[in-house]
Curated annotation (Swiss-Prot):
The gene is pyrD. PANTHER family: DIHYDROOROTATE DEHYDROGENASE (FUMARATE) (PTHR48109:SF1), DIHYDROOROTATE DEHYDROGENASE (QUINONE), MITOCHONDRIAL-RELATED (PTHR48109). Its EC number is 1.3.1.14. One of its GO terms (molecular function) is dihydroorotate dehydrogenase activity. The active site is at C136 (nucleophile). PROSITE patterns: DHODEHASE_2. Belongs to the dihydroorotate dehydrogenase family. Type 1 subfamily. This is Dihydroorotate dehydrogenase B (NAD(+)), catalytic subunit. NCBIfam families: PRK07259.1, pyrD_sub1_fam. Its cofactor is FMN.
Length: 311
């Protein structure tokens, strides 16, 4: 939104969190420090922010190059680098004390007990919610290695719910035969919402040398190219689940956000597009608001899942 302009609709409730608008920073490099999270909230206008994924032990991630820009988006294989939950507590506390928006901690582990350990270990910093990363496609033993197994997803979700009293979101991988099976497992485990989608498996090769471009060879594709995948996944999950679906994948404009919301997203996360402009959240919020006014919708809830009424 233009400087000084605020979302004029009522505060937006999502799993009990009060958001100033339905846009959220997706987990990624801008969530690495408390200062960067605050910048996105204050300068960018995000309704909430999600941290970089944090695990049980320090992790350096994959060798460079670990991220490249493509015509259609980004390809990355970061490998979940992080300082561990004890090493991140101070950053999370800073974000909580200075961002003025809900702060969601993204966490990962290789087993239910590790997820529970990290979740419980971050509680002193008082995150507003937790997002379980069971969907990263380029970290062996973590992420999608967990998130492609419905039984394990249910167990991980239940283990975290047992040790926290804040909302738990589960971020799903699109790299499965049927994402609704994974969504149902998360819901059965007690998830308060699911987030769809994480990156799509991808690869790039330097044709002059024949070498894969990424240090890890393959990685995850994000950006505009994955939006149709995200729309379909959100649409299917909205039909299959009773809990909210948070849409993410390829959102770079208010039109993209509205499309995901019509597919069933209760809110939208933005990741890759933030690399071009941090104030994209304000732009998207203003665009959604203008769209609602132009179409005569008195409540943003009127467009959530609207496409399901058209068939």
């Amino acid at each position: 939104m233009p400087a000084g302009r605020k979302w004029s609709y009522p505060m937006y409730n999502l799993t009990g969190l009060e958001l100033k608008n339905p846009t959220i920073l997706a987990a990624g490099v801008l969530g690495t420090t408390g200062a960067s999270l605050c910048r996105v909230a204050r300068e960018g206008g995000a309704g909430a922010v999600v941290t970089k994924s944090i695990g049980p032990a320090p992790k350096t991630g994959h060798s460079n190059p670990s991220m490249i820009k493509l015509d259609c988006g980004f390809l990355n294989a970061m490998g979940l680098p992080n300082p561990s939950y004890p090493g991140f507590l101070q950053e999370l506390e800073f974000a909580k004390n200075n961002s003025a928006v809900p702060v969601i901690a993204s966490i990962f582990g290789g087993a239910p007990s590790e997820f529970a350990e990290v979740a419980e270990g971050l509680l002193p910093a008082k995150p507003d919610a937790l997002e379980l990363n069971v969907s990263c496609p380029h970290a062996e033993g973590y992420g999608a290695a967990v998130g492609s197994n419905p039984c394990l997803v249910e167990a991980v979700t239940a283990a975290v719910k047992d040790v926290v009293n804040v909302p738990v979101w589960v971020k799903l991988t699109p790299n499965v035969a049927d994402i609704t099976c994974i969504g149902n497992a998360a819901e059965s485990g007690g998830a308060d919402a699911v987030v769809a989608i994480n990156t799509v498996k991808g690869m790039a090769i330097d044709i002059e040398s024949g070498y894969p471009v990424l240090g890890n060879r393959s990685g995850g594709l994000s950006g505009k190219a994955v939006k149709p995948v995200a729309v379909k996944c959100v649409y299917d999950l909205y039909t299959a689940l009773e809990i909210p679906v948070i849409g993410v994948g390829g959102v770079s404009s208010w039109e993209d956000a509205v499309e995901l919301m019509m597919a069933g997203a209760a809110a939208v996360q933005v990741g890759s597009a933030v690399y071009d402009r941090v104030d994209i959240f304000s732009e998207i919020g203003a665009g959604i608001e203008a769209f609602l006014e132009r179409k005569g919708y008195s409540d943003i809830q009127k467009i959530i899942g609207l496409s399901h009424e058209m068939v």
